[in-house]
Amino acid sequence: MTVSPLLAKSIKLLPKPARRILNNANDRLFRARDLVLAEQTPFEVIYSNDLVKLRHYLPISQDEIMVDGIPMTVNKNTHKVPLVIVPPLAVNMLIYDLFPERSLVKYFVAQGFEVYLIDWGTPTRKHTHYNLNTYVSEFMPEFLAKVREHSGQKQLSLHGWSMGGIFTLCYTVLTHDTDIRNLVILGTPINSHASGAVGKVYQAIERRAQWVRKNTGFRIHNLNPQWLHTPGWANVVGFKMTNP
């Protein structure tokens, strides 16, 4: 964007914080495409349904990549057991491939793994009938079957972060899938009631919920799921408010 000399002179007279805001706004509006560094690791979508897509990341052709400024040799020997990344619902898949030198999927591919990622998509109000059972008992078996079909391998390693870890654990327990070779669980609550001070809060809420259920018969499961739909921007605001 070309700025007239008069406008440029006026901007220079503004306080420094205001100039920063204008510069950032200019970048976001007119240079957004140039600023995006995420999702540069090549992948192909090998399967999709109405909402969810399955990504397969392609082998790296270079002999060496940079990881946070440090050179790393690319392993050309592929591990036999594919790695399936199971994300939480409330994140953008860009987080796994954020920068060329800070990319989890690129790092795993460079280490010789066949990397797959289940992209949950962006649920809308027409998906409010989906529940935990939908993801654990329907989507997980469906998409892991496609990974096995594409890779030709029965054994899989699952990498679950946050709610993705819950999906991974529930799937493994409920299906008794003996071909899950490894489980990597990050930031996933296993027993929320035992989580220190936060766990005490959960225990108090549970006691009150039991009292309400006992005395009124009310259960939150009986509410219309559309009333509980949370838009993505609300999740963003909530997480930012917890940032110190």
State each model region's role.
Residues 127-129, 196:
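Conserved catalytic-core motifs of eukaryotic protein kinase domains, centered on the activation segment
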Residues 100-103, 134, 201-202:
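Glycine-rich, phosphate-binding/catalytic loops in enzymes
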Residues 159-168:
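Gly/Ala-rich beta-loop-alpha elbow adjacent to hydrolase catalytic centers
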Residues 2-17, 149, 153, 167-244:
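Alpha/beta-hydrolase-fold enzymes
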Residues 1-39, 75-76:
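N-terminal targeting or regulatory segments adjacent to alpha/beta-hydrolase or S9 domains
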Residues 82, 156, 181:
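Conserved acidic residues
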Residues 39, 45-124:
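Short, surface-exposed "cap/lid" segments of acyl-processing enzymes
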Residues 130-150:
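Alpha/beta-hydrolase active-site loop
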